[in-house]
Amino acid sequence: MSNRKALLGKKLGMSQVWDENGFFVPVTLVDVSTNVVTAVKTEESDGYKAVQLGYGAIDPTKVTKPLAGHFAKAGVTPRRHLVEVRTDDVDQFEAGQELAADLFEEGAEVDVTGTTKGKGFAGTIKRWGFKSYRRTHGSHKNERRPGSVGACATPSRILKGKRMAGRMGHVTATTQNLTVVSADVENGILAIKGAIPGPKGGIVLVRSAVKGA
């Protein structure tokens, strides 16, 4: 296990900032303003070490009674999103503790996990990058067809994992080893170099890089 730190946040969109050499750096802005520790898991009580984080306000009347009791035990108002992060540094956290953007220092390497944009039902060319058929004489409505998908009498079926048309996107993805350009504690915003998964308004998890850089 590692000493990974984490924050839940909402993707606000992309911008650009100047670096010390006078170059524009593309950054993604992430709102991490309402993070709070809702539970601390220890070896003695739970069999493993982890910290549970809550993010985003929610109407208390829309929270189930078991969850309402969970939040009340932690001494925090109900939160819309919960996530649990494994870490060895559970002694540094306690239930009800608020976490700010400065949990990550400028220059820190992070992994960002989010849900990618959904593209709907897509064909094999868009979804998998298949080559289209030649657009010339003799071609009849074949330009974007996938071609043969199976064998003959043996194995008499299409093998699992065959790349075919289907729903594209809206899956969990992680972009690794991104750099924190700045941490605005007053406004609760992290500026992370580069692009991260998901649309504007999407919920993301920012964690210390597992592979380093």
Curated annotation (Swiss-Prot):
One protein family per Pfam: Ribosomal_L3
Which Gene Ontology molecular-function terms are recorded? rRNA binding; structural constituent of ribosome
Sorted keywords for this record are:
Ribonucleoprotein, Ribosomal protein, RNA-binding, rRNA-binding
One Gene Ontology cellular component annotation held by this UniProt entry: cytosolic large ribosomal subunit
Q: Give GO BP annotations, semicolon-separated.
A: translation
Q: Which domain of life is it from?
A: Bacteria
Q: Which InterPro entries match?
A: Ribosomal_uL3, Ribosomal_uL3_bac/org-type, Ribosomal_uL3_CS, Transl_B-barrel_sf
Tell me which SUPFAM superfamilies the record gives.
Translation proteins (SSF50447)
HAMAP family xrefs = Ribosomal_uL3_B (MF_01325_B)
NCBIfam families linked to this entry: L3_bact
Name the protein family.
Belongs to the universal ribosomal protein uL3 family.
- Which PANTHER family does the UniProt entry name for this protein? 50S RIBOSOMAL PROTEIN L3, LARGE RIBOSOMAL SUBUNIT PROTEIN UL3C
Assembly: Part of the 50S ribosomal subunit. Forms a cluster with proteins L14 and L19.
Q: What does this protein do?
A: One of the primary rRNA binding proteins, it binds directly near the 3'-end of the 23S rRNA, where it nucleates assembly of the 50S subunit.
Could you tell me what this protein is called?
Large ribosomal subunit protein uL3
Organism encoding this protein: Bifidobacterium longum (strain NCC 2705)
